[in-house]
From Swiss-Prot:
The active site is at residues 323-324. The gene is hisD. Signal peptide: none annotated. This is Histidinol dehydrogenase. Keywords: Amino-acid biosynthesis, Histidine biosynthesis, Metal-binding, NAD, Oxidoreductase, Zinc. It is an enzyme of class 1 (oxidoreductase). InterPro entries: Ald_DH/histidinol_DH, Histidinol_DH_CS, Histidinol_DH_monofunct, Hstdl_DH. Pathway: Amino-acid biosynthesis; L-histidine biosynthesis; L-histidine from 5-phospho-alpha-D-ribose 1-diphosphate: step 9/9. The keyword Zinc applies.
Length: 431
């Protein structure tokens, strides 16, 4: 880990060290994904079978996973695993249930009533990556809010063979359909539909560069589907003072670094002693990790920043806008009102990032790459949409009419003006 003293850097150097690595999909990925999307749109299920065999080296018997297969997968899980998944489900459901919006109804002036109501997005698609380890936690983070929001149809795609844990959580979340499809072809299938795969309105979930690019392409096509948020490498920033536990900090940094070689890991502290202790602790703990080689690559570009105060540490964090922000200080909650840009914040010694990743109740689908300045963590609102309503009485319209007419005249929109005056004239004619 590289250590720098913030005050010794010029403004240009400060900008440079906090710059994320460029996300370069490359023309080859863009073209390859466009080809996959076109093939799925043209050939439907046949393309899905062909591409699954090509990319995943698996020949599924069917696109859709059967109820029997889901039940058999559930039966294979240990009681311990089921209990863990059910506890996580309960906590996530409790937190997301609390996010249910309250309808708004306001009389802005006599006879003019404005309302706001929320409706679920009708059909949503969840993408769960494959790979060496299953990700049932991601199914929970996507499936629970979709269920609570009341989405009419929820489907899930994952590369075959789909892990038992994923199928069990799909059952917990009452997901309607599960498909043996991964990669860009899964995104295309959900965005445009095939004989077996339901076309959805919005697609959620992480994935590799091909999945990310497929999501981008379908979201830019009005015939495609909306997506949850832009994606980038995972990241953590830790703010720590001299009271922090260096071993805890090292463990938190490494838990992020093991995600992938492009993970971003940053410690900001006014304590040189803590910086040195964390450097030593990281090296000791690194040797014990099964994914040490991956974590080591991420650490090669990681940073320890020596700030001159906690106030400056907060400013650095707000400027960087991390996906995960851990605050290990004497009074972490005192800093909370000053923290503006973060996907999820973990306060105090006993709040490791892992808790939020799996089971505390918050959502682990978070904006990265500095998007925390404008994007929020995934929540119930992402599976819903707002509608406004207005209802005017006859007297309400008459009272509001002069304002609307004056503004319509200023904008040169005669038909807008006439839509009001024609009504007022009829009201006046009635006497």
């Amino acid at each position: 880990m590289r250590t720098v003293v913030w005050q010794s850097l010029s403004e240009t150097q400060q900008d440079a060290i906090l710059e994320r690595p460029a996300i370069t999909e490359g023309a080859n990925i863009t073209a390859a994904v466009a080809e996959v999307i076109a093939k799925v749109r043209a050939e439907g299920d046949a393309a899905l079978f062909e591409l699954t065999e090509k990319f995943d080296r698996v020949k599924p018997e069917s696109i859709r996973v059967t109820e029997q297969e889901i039940e058999e997968a559930s039966a294979r899980l240990t009681a311990k695993m089921k209990q863990a998944l059910e506890q996580a489900y309960a906590n996530i459901a409790k937190f997301h249930n609390a996010q249910k919006p309250t309808p708004i109804k306001v009389e802005t002036q006599p006879g003019v009533v404005c309302e706001q109501v929320t409706r679920p997005i009708q059909k949503v698609g969840l993408y769960i990556p494959g790979g060496s380890a299953p990700l049932p936690s991601t199914v929970l983070m996507l499936g629970v809010p979709a269920q609570i929001a009341g989405c009419r149809k929820v489907v899930l795609c994952s590369p075959p063979p789909i892990a038992d844990e994923i199928l069990y959580v799909a059952k917990l979340c009452n997901i309607d359909e599960v498909y043996n499809v991964g990669g860009g072809q899964a995104v295309a299938a959900m965005a445009y539909g095939t004989e077996s795969v339901t076309k959805v309105d919005k697609i959620f979930g992480p994935g590799n560069a091909y999945v990310t690019e497929a999501k981008r392409q379908v979201s830019n096509d009005f015939r495609g589907a909306a997506i949850d948020m832009p994606a980038g490498p995972s990241e953590v920033l830790v703010i720590a003072d001299e009271t922090a536990d260096a071993d805890f900090i090292a463990a938190d940094l490494l838990s992020q670094a093991e995600h992938g070689p492009d993970s971003q890991v940053v410690l900001v502290t006014p304590s040189v002693l803590i910086a040195d202790q964390v450097t030593d602790a990281v090296q000791k703990q690194l040797k014990q990790l099964s994914r040490a080689s991956i974590a080591e690559k991420a650490l090669a570009s990681s940073l320890i920043i020596i700030a001159d105060s906690l106030t400056q540490a907060v400013s650095i964090s707000n400027y960087y806008g991390p996906e995960h922000l851990i605050v290990q200080t004497k009074n972490p909650r005192e800093l909370l009102p000053l923290l503006d840009n973060a996907g999820s914040i973990f306060l105090g010694d006993w709040s490791p990032e892992s808790a939020g990743d799996y089971a505390s109740g918050t959502n682990h689908v978070l904006p990265t790459y500095g998007y925390t300045r404008t994007y929020s963590s995934l929540g119930l609102a992402d599976f819903s949409k707002r509608m406004t309503i207005q209802e005017l009485s006859a007297e309400g319209l008459k009272t509001l009419a002069p304002t609307v007419v004056t503004m319509a005249e200023a904008e040169g929109l005669d038909a807008h003006k006439r839509a009001v005056t024609i009504r007022v004239e009829k009201l006046n004619a009635r006497g």
